[in-house]
Amino acid sequence: MDSRIITPGPYRATKLWNEVTKHFRAAMPLRKHRQHFKAYGNCFTASEAIDWLHQLLKTNSNFGSEVTRQQTIQLLRKFLKNHVIEDLKGRWGTEELEDNNSLYRFPSTSPVKTIPSRPPLWKRSSLENVFKEKEHLFKMPQFSKKTPKRRASVDSKEEQENEDLMEDQRNDDDFPKQLSSKDIEDIWGNITMIHLQKILGLPSLEEVLNPAQIKPNYIRYNMTNTSKHGVVVLQDKTDDLPHWVLSAMKCLANWPKNNDMSQATYIGFERDVFRTVADYFLNLPEPLLTFEFYELFVNILVVCGYITVPNSHNGKHRFHNKTRDPAPAKKQHLNDEQFFKSTECLLLSLVRKVPNEEEDDVEHSFGEIARDNKDHIPRDVFAKKNHLYGSFSRRASRGTIGGSCQNLSTSRKETGVTRKVRVRSCSLEGIADSVSTDVRDCQSNILQPSSQKPEFSVVKERPITFGNQAESVTGLNASEHKLHYRTSDGGYSQTSEKLARSVSVGDCLESRTSKNAPVAEITIKPLKSKQTRMQKRFSPTDNEPTDLDFTVTKRLCQSTMELSHSSFPSTSSLLPPTTSPNSTGSESLLQPHLEKVAIEALQLCCLLLPPANRRKLQLLMRMISRMSQNVDMPRLHDAMGTRSLMIQTFSRCVLCCAEEVDLDELLASRLVSFLMDHHQDILQVPCYLQTAVQDHVQYLQRPRVKQGTVPEYYFCKQISAQEFEEQRLATSQAAIMELLENIVRDKALAVKDKKKKLKQFQKQYPDIYQSRFPTTESEAKLFGDKPTIKQPMLMLKKPKFKSLRY
């Protein structure tokens, strides 16, 4: 079905109603049916209408294939109630329609509903207001600028409608104009946001994306200026990568094929080349995904449920969930059987299904911390957060555990003051910052060195700086002037008073990682005694009353340990899950359909980047993907594999926030790993978006017939009575003359019958007969001359009979 996309905005349900009813009345097959020994034409049965309308809704781009047959029956009942269809006796106004062979037909009246002329007050920050200055470009002819009075008479309303129609006609006269470059860029931005909202299934993008950050010219450039491999081609070469960086990246990506052995090489040559590339990207003024889009990409990961939970804790939490909610899976199909009294609600439910918000599903969106502190946070806070993430968390897996990737702040029990949950996706480490006192107490208990002699290890390699922060090649914080040491039993400490953030929260939780887990440039081998001691310290069977902040800190440590369990040691902690000896006991919660959603959403989000950043991201992802898959690549680090090194090195130069306190290194690492696995799909040009823009531009530039040039209705011209009599006689005589000629020229008619018909004609129309045969000669000539004397009889010779002799 050739349909247009109904954009989210005012009167969307009315537009959907007009769209569906228009196609239903125009294309629904009508035929002859028999019922109760009678035949009825131009009608259809209820079952035929349900089958045809169901297929129509499934193929329509506004609804999709998720429309059920029961929803189609509800829509047909609304059609019967609103007089879109009626039964054979002309009855309508009720919803008494079943899936049977009852006959229905279309009435003569049009079911199209008029759209109110007054637009609502738009929010200044809403997505629909982004291209507000080009409102006339996407304006429908049914919209009216003038609002009629509520209590006006019928005549005044008709006059008002005529004035509005004339005004729309004047506006349509200059409508098929040439679109400017700015208009086409606005179309690119508008359609991109529509597809992104449809992919995520959110009612609005306000909680995910700031409309002021959208630059349609970037989207258009990234879609149109590409090479045959899909890489952005920059017209301004000043923003491109330097030639020496491109040469180094090409050398590493094609190692050892592209390595010219004629040049002087030495041991560790590939490490120096890699360090050169890493130095360039880590010294960029901002990350490749830019600071302003940090929230966008993190929210995409959170909305899609991109969290991993180990099996050791998963069983306990799942049992806990089942005891509180014994049958949560039955609530998924409530919308299929839900009855809508409002036609608008029914149409909008067909467009997109959003499950009802429930208090039992809070833990799926907020993770483990929310489960332990659910009683201390008000209901409205959870409702606000669930509005953005609730549907995708439940859609990912019912009864499973979400990840603790939100920044939740709780207060002490004795104060009774509850802090507000932040709407944005924030750092796991930010939780520790919000309760710094108790976190330091927890860290001092966890990281307390033993009485044994500590072993010192100085970071000797030169750190690579990113902005104002010191970074090692592995991407973890390490300052030149800080001396790290490790105790023999596995504890951590520092000579400086304040612990580095990656050490204080991240590195203290490496007890469950493999033996080759990297921490900066130091290789740490966790001992069995440390693991046993930390498991005992974090034992969930501790029933002693503790302070609320300490409870939050203990849950934080457990959650961060669980998330880091499969991120650092394994080569890939993403879907599809990989079996690795270092990542045993982990289970991925990202379902296959949500993985596809994440790929499509990130594909559109990467189009919002500046062209220079998108090109650098494409080349970087190609390089690190080839390096991680290259078996001939020498080891670039003594303590970790190539893939882990790529992720830890370039995670901060790909995704980073302006404020260090909000940086979530775990999500950044997972995003880079996800980009490595799916960079060919994410960073390619979406063909469907380009087709949608071209179709919309052609729709706006199509030639139109001006209103009023061709009359829509034709009326008979009034004539006088004399002219009517003259026309009546002339037309009648001409027809009678034609009848006479047919009798005369009919050769198949016998002469006797022809004479009989001519006599009858002469008796009825003597004047016309006289004009055709003025004399008897002309009449005789018609039959020809025939002799009146009979021919003499033939003389037959009589036979002679012989006499009979006796």
Curated annotation (Swiss-Prot):
The DEP domain, residue ranges: 24-108
Keyword Zinc-finger: no
Chain intervals with Basic and acidic residues compositional bias: 167-177
Annotated keywords: GTPase activation
GO CC, alphabetical: nucleus; transcription repressor complex
The keyword NAD appears for this protein: no
Biological processes, Gene Ontology terms: intracellular signal transduction
Source species, domain of life: Eukaryota
Entry-linked SMART domains: DEP (SM00049)
Listed name of the protein: DEP domain-containing protein 1A
